[in-house]
């Protein structure tokens, strides 16, 4: 960890506890700050808050009182999920108090360089692929951010010869000031999180913060097939490395003659890649680009791609029952993810979909229903998905109350050789705490069929 003195004796407000807030507060105390921790949940229900209080921190729970800002606050470290429209953040901004997220702290103390990966879809798969490729290439990666350990915990122990690989959301990237990844990858962009950002434009600009502090000594890995990403890459001063699944890229990564190439070097045959789905070729090209920029050999990259089968809850193969294959794609929290999942299969498919209603319709899914023989919907968006399925002319459409019921109905509507796919196209928070919980319940329900 770097020697950092900028926080000594400063009053710093950590807003929202959870894992990242707990780690940030603990780190700041270690760096000599006077830490004030604030969380909306009452103290009696907040184990982490009680632990921080036991460490001698000033802990205020049960709301976000504006009076906290009268304590000569030098910095606010916010939980990514707390919107900037929250009154305490509005007031902090008016007082010109800097507001950052935990990943900014991690960067400031880290001896190791960062690789940052963002995009609407594919972040976790690309992050894991990058980590595995760097590990195979003996580049000493450590993984942090939305997957793995909280970034500022990882950064405390990261050495100069290591690489911190981070998956970054728009929420996290809105709160960066100095964060400067050696390599920044922007995978794709489409309309999402409008309840937080308001417009697609603002969402894209938040993502583009990944380029904010890059210089000509850094690299920006860009999806050349995504017009929005290409436009936002104008914010990067780094060396741009493009990747594409649709056209040849002479100075980047592409697919040619059924093989993946990087800067004219043939790296791996497509047929040697075990990870399913056309969309995953984009993720692979991005990860391969990062690995090659950091000096990983094509042999190491190929070795990973011959064994990497995917990430849990992301088009995850579950089991086969009576020649029906079950796939868990619970991470598909938006339409684009479900479109890509449906495009991955040519077999007749029974789709399970539904979840939190964020106000959108689902007509964009209709062109991807060509192999869908039946749909079972659940959750708040069930009626909207039914309308889209009716417009698509599906013969078998059913709505149920629970995911357990949906699995039973989906199996009943399937026949020999079918795929049964959970790809909800919605967030999980109407019925589940997380998409992981939703995926785990799906897997449990599938195993009950055996």
From Swiss-Prot:
GO CC, any one term: cytoplasm
Gene that produces this protein: murD
Record-listed ATP binding positions: 119-125
UniProt feature coiled coil, ranges: none
Family: Belongs to the MurCDEF family.
Keywords noted in UniProt: ATP-binding, Cell cycle, Cell division, Cell shape, Cell wall biogenesis/degradation, Cytoplasm, Ligase, Nucleotide-binding, Peptidoglycan synthesis
Matching SUPFAM superfamilies: MurCD N-terminal domain (SSF51984), MurD-like peptide ligases, catalytic domain (SSF53623), MurD-like peptide ligases, peptide-binding domain (SSF53244)
Main localisation: cytoplasm
Class of enzymatic activity (EC top level): ligase
Catalytic reactions of this protein: UDP-N-acetyl-alpha-D-muramoyl-L-alanine + D-glutamate + ATP = UDP-N-acetyl-alpha-D-muramoyl-L-alanyl-D-glutamate + ADP + phosphate + H(+)
Role noted for this protein: Cell wall formation. Catalyzes the addition of glutamate to the nucleotide precursor UDP-N-acetylmuramoyl-L-alanine (UMA).
Domain of life of the organism encoding this protein: Bacteria
Record-level GO BP terms: cell division; cell wall organization; peptidoglycan biosynthetic process; regulation of cell shape
InterPro entries, A to Z: Mur-like_cat_sf (IPR036565), Mur_ligase_C (IPR004101), Mur_ligase_C_dom_sf (IPR036615), Mur_ligase_cen (IPR013221), MurD (IPR005762)
GO terms of molecular function: ATP binding; UDP-N-acetylmuramoylalanine-D-glutamate ligase activity
Record EC number: 6.3.2.9
Pathway the protein takes part in: Cell wall biogenesis; peptidoglycan biosynthesis
Protein name: UDP-N-acetylmuramoylalanine--D-glutamate ligase
Subcellular location: Cytoplasm
